[in-house]
Amino acid sequence: KLSSKKSDAFRVDHIGFLFQQFNLIPYLNLIEHVLLPCRFSKLRYQNAGNTESSLKDEACRLLNLLGLEPDKFSHLATQKLSVGQQQRVAAARALIGNPKLILADEPTSALDPENRLAFLRLIFRECLKNQTTLIMVSHDTSLSAQFDQVINLGVLYRVNEP
């Protein structure tokens, strides 16, 4: 069993989180948000570039990939971004440093149908490139066709009933 400290270190080193509510910190800019996991994890810091300038380049690459030009948006407070833009900042934060697992809770809920599939394809492409496993929770059953494996928790619960 891991100690609390080692458990925290394992989580930050190996798991990227994409929360439904984004959990963006109001006083951080876009780049600072994306780089946050690298401030807590030496492994993700090394994977993302290992120098401040290469870290910033990787953060900018992810933001650009997700349709947020850092030069255009970096001056805005996170509260001034649209909900969809905030969600993309949170996605870049989850992806930085190549975690082995990304846990995503309703990551497409704030996106319109046009952007939903494009967003997922970008996440899938980055996960495939970095050999990252994506576990996503969603109530949107129309997205199930995009995944290799789908588990219906309602069915799962019934199977486990005594």
Q: What are these model-predicted stretches?
A:
Residues I102-D105:
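Catalytic Walker B motif of ABC-type/P-loop ATPase nucleotide-binding domains
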Residues L28-P37:
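Short coil-to-helix segment of the ABC ATPase nucleotide-binding domain corresponding to the Q-loop/switch region
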Residues A77-L81, Q85:
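Conserved ABC ATPase signature
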Residues D112:
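ABC-family nucleotide-binding domains
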Residues G49-K72:
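Conserved ABC ATPase "signature" region
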Residues N98:
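Conserved catalytic motifs of ABC-family nucleotide-binding domains
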Residues A91:
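Hydrophobic anchor residue at the start of the ABC signature
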